[in-house]
């Protein structure tokens, strides 16, 4: 577990692509669209590094599956709400003390690659 004063390591999931209903406009809610999600999980990974056992670390595959399932089913209106959902899911994982979540909607605004939000949350904010 993370101890006060010790450094937090980072586990990341980069460019996770979900397809889900997201948006405030009627046309955005007609069919699933691409949602791009980036996650940085902050945890003390020293024990996992020493033991070489995934049970002592953060299983990014488990996190990715939960995030994909939620993102594809949630039908949120805003990227802010989806980002908050993802942050909560991540902070439920054992050992994760802080999370940074970026949710983007590629092609949502003309002449831009994507738009979105990036948030940070800590486990203590959920307690």
Regions from the PLM with identified roles:
Residues 2-127:
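N-terminal, polar/charged subdomain of small-to-medium soluble alpha/beta proteins
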């Amino acid at each position: 577990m993370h101890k006060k004063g010790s450094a937090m390591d980072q586990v990341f999931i980069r460019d996770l692509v979900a397809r889900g209903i997201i948006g405030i406009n009627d046309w955005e809610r007609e069919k699933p669209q691409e949602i791009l999600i980036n996650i940085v999980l902050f945890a003390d990974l020293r024990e996992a590094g020493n033991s070489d056992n995934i049970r002592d670390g953060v299983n990014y595959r488990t996190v990715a599956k939960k995030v994909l399932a939620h993102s594809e089913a949630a039908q949120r209106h805003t990227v802010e709400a989806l980002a908050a959902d993802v942050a909560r899911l991540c902070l439920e994982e054992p050992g994760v003390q802080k999370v940074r979540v970026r949710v983007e909607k590629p092609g949502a605004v003309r002449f831009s690659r994507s738009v979105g939000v990036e948030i940070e949350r800590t486990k203590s904010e959920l307690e």
